[in-house]
Amino acid sequence: MGDSDDEYDRKRRDKFRGERESYRTERRDDRRPVGGSAGARDEWAERNPFRGGASAGGGGARHRPDYSDYRGPGARPRYGSPVRDLPPAKRMRPDWGDGDVRANPRFGGYDPYLMQAWNDHYQSMHSAYSHGGHAPPVRESIGGGGGDTLTQPAMLNLKQFLDTQDENISDSEVMRKYTEYKTDFKRQQLNEFFVAHKDEEWFKNKYHPEDSVKRSEEQRGFLQRRTDVFMELLENGTIGSVKVDSSQADALIRVLDTCVIKLEGGTDEDLKVLDEKPKDPVVYERKAEQMQSVKEVEKTINSPKEEMSEADPVSTQRKPVRPVNSDGENWDDDDAENSAPKKELAEDSKDSDSKPEDKQLNKKKTKKRKRNSSDDDSSSSESSSSSDEEKLKEKYDVEDGLRAEQKTEAEKDRQEATKAKQGPQSPKLDEDEGNENTEPKGLDSKINTYEEIDNTLKSPEISSNPIKNTDNGDGSKVEEDGEKPSVGKDKVVETETIDLDKVKDGQPRALHRTSSIFLRNLAPSITRSEIEAVCNRFSGYLRVAIADPLVERRWYRRGWITFMRDVNIKEICWGLNNQRLRDCEMGAIVNRDLSRRVRPANGITAHKQVVRSDIKLCAKIALNLDEKFRLWAEGPKDDSNSARANESSENGSGSTYGFNSQNPVLQNITDYLIEEASAEEEELLGLTGENKDTEGEPIERDEQLISVLDRLVLYLRIVHSVDYYNHCEYPYEDEMPNRCGIIHARGPPPVRVTNNDVQEYIKIYESKLQQFLTKTVPLSDEEIKNLGAKDAETEVEKFVQANTQELAKDKWLCPLSGKKFKGPEFIRKHIFNKHEEKVDEVRKEVQYFNNYLRDPKRPQLPEHPGTSKRPESESARGGGGGYRPPMYPPFSAMPYGFGPPMMGGGRGGRNFPPARRELPLEHQRRLIGYHDLDAPANSDMFD
């Protein structure tokens, strides 16, 4: 059983196979004598502790595969010297990322066999690597090789860089070359990142000379619309009537919803929906009673001749789900099939009124559509019809208004069925008897209700016709028949009215309530237009928002798709999950509504001193954001304004708050920034602030200051999407499902507060708002030149030279057109005349790259952990005292913690104490010992 599969599996799991495989090829023949007939090294049996009976002679032992057969192709890279014959030390399990703990990536910081230091010594002499003793770990080398990895490749530190230079180089020359190396390294990383992401939409929206302008104009349009809405609410007193306190949560939510309705294009009539009780959302979930109702319908079919119509109720139950499936290109065909029976029914009803002789034909068509209209005349059918209607209402939880419309339609269908059954009579007699004989046709009413729900869910604009009929009470038959053929005409006009609330004339629309889907996984190559093309298949689609990519998610993005409130959002989500964009699963899930829209902040914010500080900070933030987007600028942005902005940004903040701004919210704001105190009175009365500091003082509210602050806070929240009390900004909020969704307000105040607490709170809060207080100034031309900025004319010249090829003497080729010329000057003229668009693309590419460099907050890969931790780790190791180590490679540990001046003492490792001192030249403290004064002097006494 020695050669069983279990033995091979055990060998495959052997954790020391890497070490044995790495040094077996060099020293097996020298270590053991070759015995028996096994002259070749491959015939030697391995020393396996699990093979007790295997002989080492190898004569009768069967040849077994090598370890590498189980490990896959490729040999494991060995970090030791290839000329050493000693086996490497026991390999500890690596902990990737702890580069400052271990001496070598393969061997841990703790060397159990105390051989690694000497191996490192010889490795520095005979290493084949360019930097002795510094082969990068496997994962680091793999991670640094790609252009789109999580971190940049590791940059050489000064000691590693010195190993690549001549030994006779001076210190000043070393520092100059190392500075050039770091600059070139940074330029290379920026250029590689730009090349890797320049074709992605999110990157173009930030820096492309054309796309970025369009995006900024779009955002400025959003902000201008928000500003208009805020000014309208400020003038009519809506803003001034609310306090940003958590106790007034309902009033704050009403103000935010009012803004959303106005942003959606709503009117004052639509604002009345805020006074109404919010309606329950439309639920389209299928229940278990659905199949029971289908079975009951099948039981009512008595004639076998009518089996052809059995698919009708089943298909009508599936129709509400069909528009939201992924393959919904044939909705028009379904609508045409549904509208055709309606037109036939309308024509048949007309003929039944005017021509009594067509009664039999009318009966046939009615039977074909409604399946069994003449067999259910008993009272039991009425009870079954009512129970079916109740089950239908439970299955489709629609609004009360829609249920009333369905009942009205069912009543009219009963009247039509009664007329068709009783024969030709006058219209008045039909109407009078139709009101009395409403008991039969229970199955017909149920099927009609199915069809009405079908038509309402698939094309809600058709539901406007029952409303017109119900307004007239009973309504004449001529009006009803005249409305149905005009459905096609009305459909063209009302294609946008998907919301049921919009169809109802004269009723407010709940524009602030939406349904949404969250996309967890969007590849960087997916564009907004591709997502919109997928979402446009579903009814009720409004907009899509795509977040900026995240480096920790490998530049994958998240997205939110917004639909109208009354759509079947779960069916749409299911349809999106069955689709892939560019071979990427979007991971669509239903986005829940916001749980708490008003969230409390620290109650100390209501204190008068804190309120005055908040007014100052809010004014600075509002002024900076207004200047950034030029909201209140009278004319185009000129050089003088930009220069003044640069000067104020260098000082950290603008010196004026309301003087140079046309914003009415910032007018006369300095009147509230001047602090007042009774200093003289306190001095005369001998009052000091010691008691206040120890015992604290009660919260002092100044309603006038609070009203000014609330106006500023609401301005920042509504216009700039900045939640001041949460010190954050909600990005791309105009495209999100919930505009103005969350706001933080002042919470319940504490009983007493000390002056130290107030000052500490103000200081900490100001530090949290630094991202809004400091202006983002683009880098200057000199700064981007150091980062590798390109010149447009130089790049155009390179483009011309690259497209000028010499074939022979006096024969030149232009690869762009394939034409041949006698000289390069003719090709140059040809390119500028015939390929001007190519030259413009080169200039745009240069501007594209320079725009990326000008952004001080440009996206880029984070630095390698070894690069960022290097200054601390080197000082922690104790390495230093010169540029070049005398003979040992850096970061090597000597046996038993012996440390010369150039080396760090100790074996390292997190779970091992530092090694004992051997009394080097500089010891930590003076050692105290006992010395007998009568004893002779010797060299063993302590100092």
UniProtKB/Swiss-Prot annotation:
Region Disordered: start-end pairs: 1-100, 284-493, 637-662, 851-886
GO biological processes: defense response to Gram-negative bacterium; mRNA splicing, via spliceosome; negative regulation of viral genome replication; primary miRNA processing; regulatory ncRNA-mediated post-transcriptional gene silencing; siRNA processing
Compositional bias annotation for Basic and acidic residues: 8-33, 40-49, 284-308, 340-361, 388-419, 474-493
Entry keyword Phosphoprotein: yes
Entry keywords, A to Z: Nucleus, Phosphoprotein, RNA-mediated gene silencing
Disruption phenotype: Lethality.
Location in the cell: Nucleus
Residues carrying Phosphothreonine: 300
Phosphotyrosine carried by residues: 79
One Pfam family hit: ARS2
Compositionally skewed regions (Basic residues) per UniProt: 362-371
Domain of life of the source: Eukaryota
Bias (Polar residues): 456-473
Any one annotated GO CC term: nuclear body
Residues annotated with Phosphoserine modification: 81, 303, 309, 326, 349, 352, 426, 640, 642
Main location class: nucleus
Compositionally biased tracts (Low complexity): 642-653
InterPro entries (UniProt xref): SE/Ars2 (IPR039727), SERRATE/Ars2_C (IPR007042), SERRATE/Ars2_N (IPR021933)
PANTHER family in the cross-refs: ARSENITE-RESISTANCE PROTEIN 2, SERRATE RNA EFFECTOR MOLECULE HOMOLOG
Quaternary organization: Interacts with cbp20, Dcr-2 and pasha.
Function description: Acts as a mediator between the cap-binding complex (CBC) and RNA-mediated gene silencing (RNAi). Involved in innate immunity via the short interfering RNAs (siRNAs) processing machinery by restricting the viral RNA production. Also involved microRNA (miRNA)-mediated silencing by contributing to the stability and delivery of primary miRNA transcripts to the primary miRNA processing complex containing drosha and pasha.
Family: Belongs to the ARS2 family.
Name under which the protein is recorded: Serrate RNA effector molecule homolog
